[in-house]
Amino acid sequence: FGFAWPEELECSRLVNCDETAPATAPVTTNAHGTQKTPGQTRRDYGFWCPRHLHTSNGQGYKFLGIDQCAPPCPNMYFKNYELDVAKSFIGIVSIFCLCATLFTFLTFLIDVKRFRYPERPIIYYSVCYSIVSLMYFIGFLLGNRTACNKADDKLEIGETVVLGSQNKACTVLFMVLYFFTMAGTIWWVI
């Protein structure tokens, strides 16, 4: 195409971060054909756990390969405004879905005999998804309280993500949400 590679992107001009010794050091070749420099040391540019993300021993936390380190609960990827809009949207949609599914179920209760087999699974589907929307609404109301550990200024621990079943409310919320989502999906197939 006639384009020249830009000088700024020439790889030979860039410093290699994994370089273990200066480029001027003598290089020797071992029996396997790999090069080795004298006094070769490895620099570690990896992740280290900040003090406010450290957890006590025995909790089983592991974040980015570091033991006793928990992921932070505050947003890392989105602005606060974007999170507020997303949370508000989930809350509003969950209320709308809860109203729609409860309306369907209450319509069924008016005349139960009217809904025979082809229509009956829709009622079960509606009940399942009314509970799913209720779980989303409860999660919206609780905010980060179920998914995040509280910060402790005395221990210098920041707000971190809950691991596994350490928070019973988070576990119950997830289990009910998962069960009724799967049940609703199965009723949709039937």
Swiss-Prot record:
Pfam families in the cross-refs: Frizzled
Keyword terms of this UniProt record: Cell membrane, Cytoplasmic vesicle, Developmental protein, G-protein coupled receptor, Glycoprotein, Membrane, Neurogenesis, Receptor, Transducer, Transmembrane, Transmembrane helix, Wnt signaling pathway
TM region positions: 90-110, 122-142, 170-190
Protein location: Membrane; Cell membrane; Cell surface; Apical cell membrane
Top-level taxon of origin: Eukaryota
Family membership noted in the UniProt record: Belongs to the G-protein coupled receptor Fz/Smo family.
Protein's job: Receptor for Wnt proteins. Most of frizzled receptors are coupled to the beta-catenin canonical signaling pathway, which leads to the activation of disheveled proteins, inhibition of GSK-3 kinase, nuclear accumulation of beta-catenin and activation of Wnt target genes. A second signaling pathway involving PKC and calcium fluxes has been seen for some family members, but it is not yet clear if it represents a distinct pathway or if it can be integrated in the canonical pathway, as PKC seems to be required for Wnt-mediated inactivation of GSK-3 kinase.
Name the record gives this protein: Frizzled-6
Organism whose genome encodes this protein: Gallus gallus
Phylogenetic lineage: Eukaryota, Metazoa, Chordata, Craniata, Vertebrata
